[in-house]
């Protein structure tokens, strides 16, 4: 049997959950996950067994699972240990690479019921917003300032300028560009003043719409995944918003931009070399 330690926010949890399910499928070895009321982190983080991930509830157990631990040795992708269908193992780490689960992506999303989740959100939104005609734009501010300032950086305006310029070269000329932007509610004023107004002034053919603050965080992630193209922040949250929007070979031709600086420069041990699929575009600030 296989299990995994769940930790961090929604983006981190999805890496861990997708990895353990893919590992289980590869070796035909069942998995379980310990049910916890919240996710261990430096701040209180929700878990999503009662909403977004409710289809996985049948795999939860109410007691600690004490199996031999495989500790992720590096942030770079490493092949997980070969096991039999009777071995017991606990995965511990972040597993931040699509390479851990990309082969089984479609099967896992079916198990989660992701198509139904998307349809439910579309019905909830009605005609208020049409994300399929919009570019998702993510700003990550608050948790970096409050908690992660030694590990992460706030992405500068120049990155977003360069990302929009890149997308302009890929879409039909004179096509109005609609951007649906995401940030924490407490960062709204800062984002408008320091990003949205300057971007609006620079790109006359763009319009900006704020994703509703009344949506749950997981609903915002699903909404992000419904967008036509994506401009990521240095965040696993928007990484998943883009990844869930694409099929494995990106036949839907989505443009996905991510910043060249993901972590603080002093965090030299946390490599992101295996984080991004090859068809995503790195944009310099």
Predicted regions and their residues:
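Donor-binding and catalytic core of enzymes assembling or modifying cell-surface/extracellular glycoconjugates
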Residues: 10, 175-249, 253-264
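Secretory-pathway luminal glycosyltransferase catalytic domains
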Residues: 36-177, 276, 285
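Extreme N-terminal starter segment of soluble prokaryotic enzymes
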Residues: 1-3
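Short catalytic/ligand-binding loop motif for oxyanion handling, primarily in non-cytosolic enzymes
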Residues: 12, 39-45, 99-100, 144-147, ...
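Leloir-type glycosyltransferase catalytic cores
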Residues: 264-285
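Short amphipathic alpha-helix
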Residues: 16-23
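A short, glycine/small-residue-rich beta-strand->loop->alpha-helix junction that serves as a flexible
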Residues: 6-15
């Amino acid at each position: 049997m296989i299990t995994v330690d769940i930790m961090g926010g929604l983006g981190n949890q999805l890496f861990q959950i997708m990895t353990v399910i893919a590992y289980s499928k590869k070796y035909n070895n069942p998995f379980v996950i310990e049910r916890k009321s919240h996710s261990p982190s430096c701040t209180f983080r929700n878990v999503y067994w009662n909403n977004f991930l409710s289809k996985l509830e049948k795999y939860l157990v109410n007691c600690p699972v004490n199996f031999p631990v495989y500790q992720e040795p590096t942030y770079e992708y490493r092949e997980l240990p070969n096991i039999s269908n009777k071995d017991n193992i606990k995965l511990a780490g972040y597993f931040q690479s699509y390479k851990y689960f990309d082969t089984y992506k479609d099967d896992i999303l079916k198990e989660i019921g992701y198509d139904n989740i998307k349809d439910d959100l579309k019905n909830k939104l009605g005609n208020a917003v049409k994300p399929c005609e919009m570019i998702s734009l993510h700003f990550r501010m608050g948790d970096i300032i409050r908690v992660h300032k030694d590990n992460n950086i706030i992405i500068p305006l120049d990155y977003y300028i360069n990302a929009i310029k890149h997308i302009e070269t890929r879409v039909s000329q004179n096509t109005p560009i609609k951007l649906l932007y995401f940030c924490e509610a407490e960062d709204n004023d800062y984002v408008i003043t320091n990003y949205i107004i300057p971007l609006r002034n620079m790109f006359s053919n763009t319009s900006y719409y704020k994703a509703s603050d009344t949506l749950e965080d997981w609903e915002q992630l699903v909404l992000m995944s419904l967008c036509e193209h994506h401009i990521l922040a240095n965040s696993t949250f928007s990484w998943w918003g883009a990844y869930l929007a694409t099929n494995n070979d990106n036949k839907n031709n989505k443009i996905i931009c991510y910043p060249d600086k993901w972590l603080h420069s002093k965090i030299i041990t946390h490599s992101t070399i295996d984080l991004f699929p090859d068809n995503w575009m790195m944009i310099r600030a």
